[in-house]
């Protein structure tokens, strides 16, 4: 598992050295529902990735980040731990217009907190580009765990940093 994570991180950073498109940096807030709605009040996360234009209306890349679910506090009850994930995913976005995109991320979410093994990660997204590099997006996050599913509805902001190769 450590070797897989090390290989993925190495590929991510090496790809960024030769990248010509953009590095994506973002934050999002989430509201859990279904299996975790009683234990987790809300969650927040950061997103980091790289997208490359495959054509005029399609981007593909890789995304990673961190998701933290904040537990509900019960009076006099046992304190619950935060629920934490590190998603590693392939990402695709389709741009039907200059400002509207839809797509998704699919991969593996590694569980960080004790007793959390992680699971299959998927995140369909709809985004609206305002300005040249900033996007607001609405998404659903699903992480298929053993016997439960982490489900959240998310609102986030994503900023693109243009990476251009140096000319010799």
What are these regions (language model features)?
Residues 24, 70, 117-168:
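Predominantly the C-terminal beta-signal and adjacent terminal strand-loop region
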Residues 19-61, 150-168:
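Short glycine/proline- and aromatic-enriched beta-strand/turn motifs that initiate or cap beta-hairpins
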Residues 1-22, 165-168:
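Cleavable N-terminal export/targeting peptides
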Residues 33, 37-89, 95, 135:
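Glycine- and aromatic-enriched membrane insertion/assembly motifs of diderm outer-membrane
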Residues 29-35, 52, 64-72, 106-112, ...:
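Transmembrane beta-strands of outer-membrane beta-barrel pores
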Residues 95-119:
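Mid-chain, well-packed structural core segment of small domains
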Residues 17, 52-56, 94-100, 130-132, ...:
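Outer-membrane beta-barrel strand-turn architecture
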Residues 25-29, 60-64, 90-92, 102-104, ...:
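Membrane-embedded beta-strand positions of outer-membrane beta-barrel proteins
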């Amino acid at each position: 598992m450590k070797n897989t994570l090390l290989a993925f991180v190495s590929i991510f950073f090496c790809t960024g050295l030769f990248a010509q498109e953009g590095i994506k940096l973002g934050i999002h807030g989430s509201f859990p529902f279904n299996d975790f709605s009683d234990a987790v009040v809300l969650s927040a996360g950061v997103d980091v990735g790289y997208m490359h234009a495959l054509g005029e209306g399609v981007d593909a890349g890789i995304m990673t980040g961190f998701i933290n679910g904040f537990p509900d506090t019960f009076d006099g009850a046992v304190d619950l731990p935060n629920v934490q994930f590190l998603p590693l995913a392939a990402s695709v976005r389709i741009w039907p217009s200059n400002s509207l995109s839809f797509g998704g991320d699919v991969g593996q979410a590694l569980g960080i907190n004790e007793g959390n093994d992680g699971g299959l990660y998927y995140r369909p997204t709809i985004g609206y580009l305002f300005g040249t590099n900033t996007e607001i997006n609405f998404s659903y996050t699903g992480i298929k765990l053993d016997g439960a599913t982490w489900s959240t509805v998310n609102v986030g902001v994503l900023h693109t940093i243009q990476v251009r190769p140096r000319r010799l």
